[in-house]
């Protein structure tokens, strides 16, 4: 029979529950639905007893029931949700069920409820969940039944099974989305010792240390004769990749490769296997042994000029700790490096005409040496100006810091003294002012009669 097939389950969709089962139940066509879903009053039972009341016996933690609508009172259309030991609490938003095969309109809604043990508001949550399907495509007076889909979301061993014990329990759990199923894990297959895998290697080969295995060169691996997989040929090394004899293109290309060229490319194995060194030293604190201040001699040639023009550019670098100032370092360089500059100028005779006299060269060299001295003076004047500007900026920063500290102290005082203290002080001062004014008025009134009495006399 079909019901005895492995994986066969009664799990209709929301559209099928409303369009077929609930509609036929309300319209009186019970012979079409009574075989699958039983009718009970779901609030008369605790959820733990519901699996045994299901019409279809299944090991899945999902059961279906027809339930007549029951209200708390005749006047109030409030659905009854309480049981003998707990209550069903609605949660989430109602979902619309649409007819995907017919007019694609709304045919019903689905409510989600969770069962709590105890009474409101001290109920204890349980893993029992119920989806309540209501039909909306029929008139209001005919909507007297709902379909309750009861599910258990806890552990499988905690809920009594509604199926027969002869069948082997299924490990599949059906989720709310009706799509995800978790199956019991199967045993993983591992390779046995001595059995070769897809790459021609066995577990024994993997366990052998590298230094104990035979040493093969790159050409031995790329040799076309080694690439054919022949199970009857014991000379094929298990570490070589196996190819079928039909791969003529690849093998033909390998036969045209010169072996000497391949071995030459990989001859220096130490250089290939040597790890590269990364320069991670910090060069910020590096100081040279000599001062990096001097003259770079440049030359340029022009076809219209009769003599070679030599230009020198001075540059300033990091001085050694023994140098006192920029001027001293440049002076030392000019004294000690004059001969080197002359020798370098003698060598620069490639672009100009060879008829340049020694006096012309010396005058050009003198101009190139005097120019750095003037630049050094300009640098010193700029340094003095920068020092004065730095002093001004530091004084401005100090004044700003002082003003900031004063502002912070005032803010701290305001923070320590709340606003109502200032109000109290103002009121007290105003009262004292009124008292002082009243005293002055009384004194003046006392003085007026005395003055009148003196006048009468």
From Swiss-Prot:
Subcellular location: Membrane; Nucleus
One Pfam family, short name: NAM
Region (Disordered): 158-180, 302-332
Record carries keyword Acetylation: no
Upregulating conditions: By salt stress and abscisic acid (ABA) in roots.
Family annotation (SUPFAM superfamilies): NAC domain (SSF101941)
Result of knocking out the encoding gene: No visible phenotype under normal growth conditions, but mutant plants mutant exhibit reduced sensitivity to high salinity during seed germination and seedling development.
Regions of compositional bias (Polar residues) in chain numbering: 162-180, 312-332
Gene3D superfamilies: NAC domain (2.170.150.80)
Biased composition (Low complexity): 302-311
Annotated TM spans: 421-441
UniProt function note: Transcription activator activated by proteolytic cleavage through regulated intramembrane proteolysis (RIP). Involved in salt stress response during seed germination and seedling growth. Binds the auxin-responsive IAA30 gene promoter and may serve as a molecular link that interconnects a developmental feedback loop of auxin signaling with a salt signal transduction pathway during seed germination.
Protein name: NAC domain-containing protein 69
Species of provenance: Arabidopsis thaliana (Mouse-ear cress)
